Amino acid sequence: ASSGRKVLYATAEDTWKSATPRFDLQSRLKQKADILGLDWNKIRENLFVLDTVAYPELRDWNTFAETYRYVAEKEKIELAIIDSVTVLEAYRGALKYRVMELARYNQVHGITALYVNQRSTEAWDSYDMAGGIGLAHNLDGTIIIDYGRVYWQDQQVDLAVNRGEFVRIARVLDCRMCNFERRRIRVDITTDGFLRTTEPLPKTEETKA
């Protein structure tokens, strides 16, 4: 949004603007923009928010989809962020079909979309996610970010830590766009709320002409 691109942000986890603005999503994003040296006024100009917390009627799938399409076409949206995809779930088991329907719309209209999801079980570092693993296979790429206790040998090898330690990881599950490594990357959340790697990222092999 700071570069002039139109962004649509749909939130189901947090309200955009509350009576105590110190804690609302808008204030936190502004703080992060300031840290990164980005123009908040430019971001506000190009950022459009569907707040399903403040406006629960948007949790109805038909209402959400109609509003989403209207904003996307009227404002010529280039990037959409759905946080999280539970906003699309009308009933248990429907999530995958909602995401697929929205993904098809985005593809037709040239919109790049990021879908935030949660794991569906207590087991960490797994492929279990709300909507099932089939949900990930219908998208161009899936990245897992998780936190838990290291137990298995392959976790110890990937992360270079001892069994029993608690770590936060990032891991590419699938990607149709480029080559990738499946191994876990250790990450951490900084005091200013950003996700940072705690080790150098692996270099992908360059394709020789």
Q: Which residues are covered by each model-predicted region?
A:
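Phosphate-binding/switch region of NTP-binding enzymes
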Residues: 112-198, 202-204
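P-loop NTPase motor core
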Residues: 59-154
